[in-house]
Amino acid sequence: MKATVVIPTYNRASRLRELLSCLVHQDQETLAQVVVCDDGSPDDTRAVANAFEGKLPLVYRHQEDRGFRAGQARNMGISEARGDIIMFVDDDVLVAPDFVAAHIAAHRASKRTSVVLGYRHRSHEATVIPPTLEHIVASEADDRVVEIGPDGAGIAAHKMPWMFVYSCNFSVPRGTPELSFDERFLGWGLEDIDIGYRLWRAGNPVIVAPRACVLHIEDVAPRDPFRCEERKLPPTYDSYVRNAVHFMDKHEDAAVRAWVRNDLRWYVRDEERGAWVKNGYENDVEAVISACRAELRARAGALAPTQADARTEAL
């Protein structure tokens, strides 16, 4: 069994170099491909990818910069994949030498086609490349550990296991139905929860591979608005709130609606800033949803082109 590793990236050439260096240390017999999916980077991302030609079975794909389109970028990787399983990792993580093998082992051990997720621990400091698994586990723990345990055993009884599927670290067998990101999610947030939900609804259990951890190196200016908020930086929740309403509206599931509504009660439209903000007290959820639906309708005629329309280039 071999894996295709799909890496969406934008303007993080130095981080990408570190991740690719980690992948060089994997058992190369486990790697079918490493697909770098460039979301229109203006930096030297292409040159970094080129530098690993011959060291990794690397494929480079590029789409025009039309805003944050991580889902479209990952779909480029899916279309290129030749491995038995497709692994998704973000461009700002580091992995231990047995990372790919840990994902493959989890799939081999599963008696069914499964969604395999690994934890994402955090660090604010650089580390040796590749980091050891022990170093990763000793870093700031993934929030999901609290809910489903260090070994992930708690996910089996969880009513909404799809909510734990983060695109920074999960894998699925190639050819699994529903294995495609919804390209109507634009900007940061929830395209990964959506694909996790659809895969789960299609009958694929979500399981945890405890050894398949990644170490997320925190950016000075993170794209995640929740991390911005934690670090006292001005967060932008616009795409997250719109994507949450899109996620809720596309699925006729009471659990999804309740999950989204529970979250949206904390947001309000700041007309002075022209942005959605998280203000810390409960608001009229229906007003938030109605306003977001109006924004989504207004944007419907000007959505970014799909991955099929994007320019792609091979090394």
Per-region residue spans from a language model:
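Conserved donor NDP-sugar-binding/catalytic core segment of glycosyltransferases
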Residues: D98-A138
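Short, acidic, metal-binding catalytic loop of nucleotide-sugar glycosyltransferases
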Residues: S21-L31
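Non-catalytic, C-terminal membrane-associated alpha-helical segments of glycosyltransferases
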Residues: D238-S239, V256-L315
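Glycine-rich, basic loop-to-helix element that forms the pyrophosphate-binding segment
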Residues: E64-A81
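Short aromatic/hydrophobic "clamp" motif used to bind/position activated sugar donors
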Residues: I86
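Short, flexible, basic/aromatic active-site loop/helix in glycosyltransferases
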Residues: V137-W162
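A conserved acidic beta->alpha catalytic loop
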Residues: C22, D38-A47, V93-L94
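Acidic donor-binding loop at a coil-to-helix junction in glycosyltransferase catalytic cores
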Residues: W188-I195
